[in-house]
Amino acid sequence: MALADVGYRGCAALELSKEPICCAVSIHHKLAVKSELTISDLFGENLMLIRRGWNSYVDLLRDNIWENYPQINVVDFPFYDVSVFNQCESGNDVLMAIGNWENVHPLLKILPVQWDYVIPFGLLYSPNPSPQVLSFIRAVAQVYELGL
């Protein structure tokens, strides 16, 4: 399962859902006591976002923050990997995340944010899939009642 943006790396994508964009913080971060964040909670924080061009949905969020909320320091990173989650935790930063990642790191807490930003979530696969992969994709689509 992946955050899916059609055309990313030339892949095809089967979108399974649109997930609200949330934020992850260290369980020791001052925001971790909250059950939900507002945009103003992010003022004065480093907000870690994946680099521009990786996902158009994240780029919309980034553009809105740059244009309207200079109080938030956007920190770009190249790719989601374990070092990014560790940096969020040890650096006391805020990381763009989704709720499905609630168990991605034992010292991070995922918090919903009061905004309307979402990101597609699903399966990425070759634009020319093997018959086995295509069969799997169709089976998943059927389970999700997406009808391919």
List the predicted regions and their residue ranges.
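Short beta-strand segments
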Residues: M1-L3, L49, D76, M96-I98
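Acidic, Gly/Pro-rich loop/turn segments at junctions of secondary structure
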Residues: M1-S40, G44, N100-L107
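Short hydrophobic segments within beta-strands
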Residues: A24, M48-I50, L124
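Extended ligand-binding regions for polar small-molecule ligands
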Residues: S35, S40-G44, P120-L148
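Generic structural signal for secondary-structure transition and capping sites
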Residues: I21, L47, N92-D93, E145
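Beta-alpha-beta core module
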Residues: Y8-L14, K18-P20, V82-P131, S135
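Secondary-structure junction motif
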Residues: E45-Y69, V133
